[in-house]
Every structure is written in C-alpha cells, then in structure tokens.
Amino acid sequence: MNRQKVIAIDGPGASGKGTVAARVAAALGYDYLDTGALYRLTALYAQKQGVGWHDEENVSELAKKLPAVFSGSRILLGGEDVSDGIRTEAIGMGASAVAQLPKVRAALLQRQRDFLTEKGLVADGRDTGSVVFPQAELKIFLTAESKIRAERRAKQIGIPCEGLAFERILSDIEARDEADRNRKVAPLKQQPDALLLDTSRLTIEETVKKVLDWYREV
C-alpha cells in the first residue's frame, strides 16, 4: 500500500495537538483535520437531542447524519457556531464516552478519510495513525506533563494557574487521561511506529519546528 501524504498526531487531551497540527498544516500548505472535534460534535449533538452518551445505537445514528460544517477556524453544528461550545471539559468527557462506542467510530471513520486530498493533510486525534490513516508518512505521539497541560488550558481560558478553578482543570485532565488509558476501544497509548514528542519544556514554535524537521527527514 502506498504511503499517504499525511502527518498523524495523537496524544492526551490538552497536549496542544490541535494548535501544533494547525500550524504545521499552515506551514506546509496542507489541510487540517481535528478528528477529536468530530467526537466532540457528536457528544454535543447527542446532548442537544437528549440522547445519552452511552446509548450506542442512537448516538451512532446521530453520528451518521451529523450536520457539521468546518468553515475556516469556525465549526458549525446545524448552522450554529459551536467552536467554543465543544471545547468545554464536560463535552471533552462526553467525547471520550462516545469515542468508546464501536458503531460511532465506524460511522465517523469514512468521514475522516474523506478529508484527505492530493493537497496533503495534518490530522490530530486518537487512532489517526493506526486506524484512520495507517499509511501516514509521519506519526507523532504528542504529550506533556498533566500540570503543564492544565496550566496551558488555564491560560487559554484566562484564569490563574492556582486556586480551586485551576485544581478543577487539573483534576479533569487527569481523570480524562485515566479514562482514556483504560477504555477498551482505542485506548490512549503510543503506537510502535509513532515518534514521541514531549512538549513540557518546549514552546509552540519549537514544537512545530521539530515536527517539520522530522517530516522533512521521512
């Protein structure tokens, strides 16, 4: 099978996968796919429709007809801008829940693959390198210490990196890590053919440069 013009980036929540992937895509002139957004959209859509996140049959049916549109940096669901709404920790937990459902993953698989064109693609999210794009030219497992990830998330939403609100963010991130590592379907783990990139002591710019350097070497 021929290699695919894809960079696949996996890793834990709040590790900066999306920011790094988007910047790498821009630098290369490739398209960008946030696969995690599709699961977040599915979780939000299910919530809006009154469907429980563990209801595999009904959630998978919603995933098949997900009325989502990616417009630049904005994400629309049924015509409503939900770019910020899908980024809450609660919806993140919902995304982790629906992503454990095999029928939901199957429903979204082809939709993810359809994003790949001759232009090239940078995709971030679980299973991007092992299942969605197994012949990707470069596969990366991007991670950082949980406290560092919590600090980055806190700065992103404008709260101090201390106090109860910060501790809640850290607790949520660690709980999600634990759930993702131990789930039966697509658990969080580095694949054998993926390069490990710990960004705990790296800036975004340094991380992007590292990814681009690796890609030029493949």
Curated annotation (Swiss-Prot):
Keywords: ATP-binding, Cytoplasm, Kinase, Nucleotide-binding, Transferase
Reaction equation(s) it catalyzes: CMP + ATP = CDP + ADP; dCMP + ATP = dCDP + ADP
Compartments it resides in: Cytoplasm
EC number, UniProt record: 2.7.4.25
Database matches in InterPro entries: Cytidylate_kin (IPR003136), Cytidylate_kinase_dom (IPR011994), P-loop_NTPase (IPR027417)
Binding site for ATP: 11-19
GO-annotated molecular function: (d)CMP kinase activity; ATP binding; CMP kinase activity; dCMP kinase activity
Recorded GO CC terms: cytosol
Pfam families xrefs: Cytidylate_kin
Keyword Transferase: yes
Keyword Transferase: yes
Stored Gene3D superfamilies: P-loop containing nucleotide triphosphate hydrolases
Gene Ontology biological process: nucleobase-containing small molecule interconversion; pyrimidine nucleotide metabolic process
Family of the protein in this entry: Belongs to the cytidylate kinase family. Type 1 subfamily.
NCBIfam families hit by this protein: cmk
Protein's recorded name: Cytidylate kinase
Protein's organism: Neisseria meningitidis serogroup B (strain ATCC BAA-335 / MC58)
